[in-house]
Amino acid sequence: MAIFSLLIAFITIPFSAYGALPITIIKNCYDGDTCTTIDGEKIRLACIDTPELKGKKADPIPAKEARDFLNNLVTNEEVSIRRITKDRYGRTVAELFNGNINIQKLLVDKGYGQIYKKYSNQCEWSK
């Protein structure tokens, strides 16, 4: 029985090219590339850019669509997180994974965002 439990635990640990990653729970997402964890950590999704909700470059309709898509994927969900760095606003720049699904890549593949060329070297999939 102990071996079976260990096997199940091993299978359910998220793995990626980076090995086992820490788990966090997303409280909500402000927009298509910024989320907050239940611990209050602000996460800026690495390697992508999505439309802005506010400001000079605001494009509210696609921005809300990207935000809603992201919220449906990750809000109140356990996700794996690969922390990369901190940005100039103090947010953690990171990749999020739901199982084997790279959330950033999915947003780009579904048309909700684009690869952020300036930082694309931070993620294996966007190089």
Q: How would you name each of these model-derived features?
A:
Residues 3-127:
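Small beta-barrel nucleic-acid-binding modules, primarily SNase/OB-fold domains
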